[in-house]
Amino acid sequence: FARAYGELDKDKVSAREQTSDSDARKGNFMVDLKQVRGELAEQSLIPGAYCQDYETFKHIYRFVERRLRRAEISSYILLITLTDGNGDFPPLTRREEQMAVLKDEIQISLRSGDVFTQYSSCQYLVMISDASAENVEMIADRICTAFYKAIGGECQGVLLHHCYPMWPAGEK
């Protein structure tokens, strides 16, 4: 019997050691997860919409398209175009300055969960989630009003905007 108890005690000690090793591994794993989360998290939260380069915007767009297949949400794309007021490209001398102002107004006029990108030398694409078509039109009007106020009265009527609903991936 003494020998049998000795073997049982060895098994118990071995099981405790394995549990301790497992807990230690979990602890390291949790540290790793905290590190990963820290690396992924935005370090300094910039107010307003999230501006991305066009390639990243396309990836986000495709991700949202996939999400739309499962989630009951609405997302819209808003195309904002800077013109000369007659439907043509604005002169280069003013375009860069006006596009910089438009970028700032888009960023501060939207929520932090919305995303936008510069699509061309005189266009921005904006992705707006969890809003109705009417709300997206109101958002576009708010951006235009803020732009005209910031740029001054001589540039009224230079912005065009079009709103398009996003569809779930594979339903085009």
Describe every region a protein language model picked out:
Residues A49-T56, D88-M99, F116, N135-V136:
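Conserved catalytic/dimerization core of cyclic nucleotide/dinucleotide signaling enzymes
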Residues I139-T145:
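Short amphipathic alpha-helices in soluble, non-transmembrane regions
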Residues R66-R70, L102-A133, G152:
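Conserved helix-loop-beta segment at the catalytic/binding core of cyclic-nucleotide signaling proteins
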Residues I60-L82, G87-P90:
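Active-site-proximal structural segments of metal-dependent nucleotidyl cyclase/transferase enzymes
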